[in-house]
């Protein structure tokens, strides 16, 4: 025989660990058999005379409601038969069946009784399933009813989805009988939303008047209350005068006449618009339609340019609009009060502190805006709480940490707290009431640091840094995340992208763009994220690409007329055709 190898280590006891996958299922099945045979049952649930036998321990394990009932000092904890009122007996039986079987069928015939019962018993999983079922049933003819049902039962997620569906499909919803039957409070909740998806404000006015005329006798008293949420200053002059101003119901109400006069003044006095801003002058932000993208200035063919062009996603066309009076590369661009501001930049010879303002209704630039206190190029510009902020940049001598803000009512710039870090080529974004300054360069090397400004405290604080150093990057807020794309690190132009979650204070990567892009513009247009122009390390770019968050992919979607590096981008509502031809003051009465 050969040698037998014997270990010097002491023998360890033999072990075999086992977790049964069948055990929970088999146990529940047997418990349900006991219930069906009324064996070992220690409680009877009486609902509208129907008696349902069960075991306290099973009900308590599944339902916080029953657990509180049976383990506390309530009288029911000592009763063998418990009566529960204000709940459907069929729904109760289905829910107790679920406690024993893990199975339930939700359908049109039971969802309206099942959801309230699940809410009472605090069966969160069933609440979620019922809400998911109702989400799938949403259509323009029933979304208002589902919304009211969700509101009644405090189903916040279903209420949010129903609201979003109603806003997005408003043009079909306004034709439904449910819409005509709305109580005035719910009507106001809907039409006051910035997210209402309409081709023009005329549709909102027509919807309100259809609702009113469905029951004039009772609803006439609410006309002014409702019409104050129609954004009449955004109506075309022709519709305002010919339809709204001539309506007998409107003319017979003093408060309604005041609303019409307010809108006329807004249309007739464009120079006064900064002083007339309010909820009725704020354009709505409908999904997937109505917005256009402006590409402003930049660097092309070895020189700064003044050209400006406009992209309409519905036609996928780029069209030239009026150029600025000055060439501007490294220009900061933002939209405030329906006007496009171009701040600072470099004209190819000198650094600029001048500002121009574009009115899409007249297709004209004006230069009557007060200049910034410092010359700035590669500056970040954004709007927060009705003020225009200019952040960082360089003045030809040094990289800046200066921040100032513009008050359109006073036509005046004032300094606020400086950033903790000097930043040129910085990207800025506004989210949750804060102004974020992202990346850039301190004059020596690219940065991955991020800080945010709280206007309530006039203070900057650091937040989590990006995973990549980036200067001359693109930045935008999309679906409550801050997206940072492209730019340049220490070595090369970048195609990589990442996004910031303010709730977790963390950055996470997303898929890279199809091209490397430094000096890229980033903007959200009609619910889609566009990256515009830039420099790939070899050539200036005129291509644009769009990001799809569902597929996590970028795709090319056309070209500008001009190649642009360091141009600014801004998004505005598409101007109505009628408003391109300005009208004489005496034609609006």
Curated annotation (Swiss-Prot):
Keyword presence, Kinase: no
Single GO MF annotation: actin binding
Region (Disordered): 1-22
GO BP annotation list: negative regulation of synaptic assembly at neuromuscular junction; protein ubiquitination
Pathway: Protein modification; protein ubiquitination
Stretches forming Kelch repeats: 292-338, 340-386, 387-433, 435-480, 482-527, 528-574
UniProt key word Repeat: yes
BTB domain sequence ranges: 41-108
Keywords associated with the record: Actin-binding, Kelch repeat, Repeat, Ubl conjugation pathway
Domain BACK: 143-245
Function: Probable substrate-specific adapter of an E3 ubiquitin-protein ligase complex which mediates the ubiquitination and subsequent proteasomal degradation of target proteins. May have a role in synapse differentiation and growth.
The protein's name in its UniProt record: Kelch-like protein diablo
Species of origin: Aedes aegypti (Yellowfever mosquito)
Chain's gene name: dbo
